[in-house]
Amino acid sequence: LRAEGYDVPRLPLVVVSRSADLPPTLAGAPRGRILMATVATSDGLAAAREALGEENVLVLGEDEIDLARLKSTLAERGWEEQLCEGGPSLFADLLAAGVVDELCWTVVPRLTGGDAVRMATGAEVDVALRPALLLEQDGTLLGRWLVQGAG
């Protein structure tokens, strides 16, 4: 979101940030379109509440965001279907919290080198997946994988 400079989304968006740092491109979003999930000890908590409104800032832990509570809080607001497009640290934390039920993964027919990190880094996780859908076109693979045992 931050790195790619996305504009204000049409659908509700939840920014998950221990620092409560709101990307500048989202600062002018209509009230209720952006929620912030953060922690009580965040230095940016007051600024996030000012920018988004008190009711749109979810404090879900003292120092770490309770991701299971985040998922249930969003479901209580009627947001049953949730899509996460975070980085590898957030993804690992979501896996460790047991709140991921599927993975959509695209593989293109190209090898590159460099210092890239894994898909999930940080929390140690070992999650069994089973394929639900695999499509191929021009060598590109589109996959939808379900977490075994997920709800």
Language-model features: locations:
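Enzymes that bind and transform nitrogen-containing heteroaromatic metabolites
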Residues: 1-151
